[in-house]
Amino acid sequence: MVVPFKNEPGIDFSVQENVERFQKTLEQVKNELGQTLPIVIDGEHITKDDTFDSINPANTSELIAKVSKATKEDVDKAFESSNKAYKAWRQWSHKDRAELLLRVAAIIRRRKEEISAVMVYEAGKPWDEAVGDAAEGIDFIEYYARSMMELADGKPVLDREGEHNKYFYKSIGTGVTIPPWNFPFAIMAGTTLAPVVAGNTVLLKPAEDTVLTAYKLIEILEEAGLPKGVVNFVPGDPKEIGDYLVDSVHTHFVTFTGSRATGTRIYERSAVVQEGQTFLKRVIAEMGGKDAIVVDENIDTDLAAESIITSAFGFSGQKCSACSRAIVHSSVYDEVLEKAVALTKELTVGNTVDNTFMGPVINKKQFDKIKKYIEIGGKEGKIEIGGEADDSTGYFIKPTIISGLKSSDQVMQEEIFGPVVGFTKFDNFEEAIEIANDTDYGLTGAVITNNRENWIKAVNEFDVGNLYLNRGCTAAVVGYHPFGGFKMSGTDAKTGSPDYLLNFLEQKVVSEMF
C-alpha cells in the first residue's frame, strides 16, 4: 500500500546547523566540478572529444563541466535503443513502473542537498530556490507514480447483456523531452519521468546551461535500476540535433519547456508527417508568459508591494510565472510603487554561494537581452530603481522597476525573463482586466482585492491558466496548483495535475462478447 501524496519539505536556513551543513555540501560539490560529462545511450557512457562548456553564471571563470556533444548519428543510436527498450518497458505493470519511480524519488531525497548545491553553481540559484527546485522534482515523481497507479485499471464503462467492455490506457512509444534551464531539476525530472511511468521511453536533451544538473538524474535512474534505453541522454547543440530530434519518424511526442520561438517551431515541425510515420505526434509545450498582478483600490498596500517584488525578482525574474507587469489602481498607485521601491532596496544581489536573495541571470545572451529591454523601458517610462548591469565577473543585473508605462509599451508586451517589472495604472476594474489580457500570453496572474465582485470578474475574465487571490503569481505547488497556461503560453497541459499523464497515454476499448 502506498501512503498518500505529501509535498517534500524544504530546508529551514534560519537554523544555523542547516546553514553549516549546506555550506559543507557546497564545498563538496565544488571539488567535483570541471569533469567531462558523457552522453548516455543504451546504458553506455560515451565521452566525446567535441564538447561545450557549462559555466557558473555568477563566476564566469569557473567551469562547471565539459559536456560531450551528441551528433545526429548518436541520436539515431539513441532512438534505436529507446525503441528496443520500449518493447519490454511497456510490458511492465503500472504498479512496477510506479514503484520504480518511488525508488527514484527516495534516492533524490537522500541526495537533495547535493542536487541543490549543483544548481547553486550551475544555474545561479539562491539556496531556497535551489532546494525548492529539487523538492519539486521529488513531488512531480511521487505524484506521477501515484497517478499511474490510479489509472492502472482504466475507467468503468457500461456492459450490456452478452457483452463486457473495458476502457483502459496504454503507452504511446518513444518521445523526446527538451526541458528548460530555469527549473533544471524539477521540470526536467517531471517531464522526463511522466512519460516514462506511463510506459514510454524518452530521449532527454537537457538545456545546454544546466547539463550537470540533468546528469544527476541519469545517475539516480541508474542507481534505481531503470532498464537501459528507457531514458537516453543526448546533450548537444540544438542547431545540430534539435530539429532532428523533433522531426524523427521515431518521435511520438515532444514535451518542451522554453521560449515561444522554439516552442512554436516544435509545434509546426511536429505537425509534418514524415515518410514512414504512421501516427500523429503530440506536443506538450509550455512557452512562457507576461504575467501580471492587478492591485485593486482599498487594499493592504504592504501585501501588494510584497507580492509584486517577491514574484518579480525571485530567481532574478527567470520564471515563466514571474510578475513582469504591475497593474495598480490609480488611488493606491503611488503608495504601492513607493513601497515596492523600498522593498527592492533591501534585496541582496550577488553570488548565490553566499546565500543572496538574487543571483545572476543565466548567460551572456540573456544578460544582453535584459539590458536592451531596460534601455527601452527607460525611454518608455521612468526607471525608479535598478537598471545597472555588470558582467565583469558574472551576469548580474540589479532588480529594476519601471513606472509610468502604457499597456502598449514594448516592455509591457514582450517577455523579458529577467529582474524587470513595469508599473501601469487603471481607474476601474474593467480597465484593469483589459490591460491584464492585453498580451499574447496567458500563464499566471494575481489579483489583490477585497472586493468579491471584482474577484469573481477576474475569475471569469482574466485569461490565464493559474490565477491567485491576494498573493503573488509564482510558487505553484504540485498537488495544489496544477500548472500551465493559455494562449501563447502553451498547450495548457497542466503539470502536477490528475490529467497530466493522459498526454502520454492512448485510450483503448475492448468489447468481449459471450
UniProtKB/Swiss-Prot annotation:
GO BP annotations listed: glutamate biosynthetic process; proline catabolic process to glutamate
Active site: 286, 320
Domain of life (superkingdom): Bacteria
E.C. number(s) listed in UniProt: 1.2.1.88
Pathway info: Amino-acid degradation; L-proline degradation into L-glutamate; L-glutamate from L-proline: step 2/2
GO cellular component: cytoplasmic side of plasma membrane
Reaction(s) the record says it catalyses: L-glutamate 5-semialdehyde + NAD(+) + H2O = L-glutamate + NADH + 2 H(+)
Molecular functions (GO terms): 1-pyrroline-5-carboxylate dehydrogenase activity
Coiled coil residues, start to end: none
Pfam families registered for this protein in UniProt: Aldedh
Keywords on record: NAD, Oxidoreductase
Record PROSITE patterns: ALDEHYDE_DEHYDR_CYS, ALDEHYDE_DEHYDR_GLU
HAMAP family: RocA
Matches recorded under NCBIfam families: D1pyr5carbox2, PRK03137.1
Family: Belongs to the aldehyde dehydrogenase family. RocA subfamily.
Protein name, per record: 1-pyrroline-5-carboxylate dehydrogenase
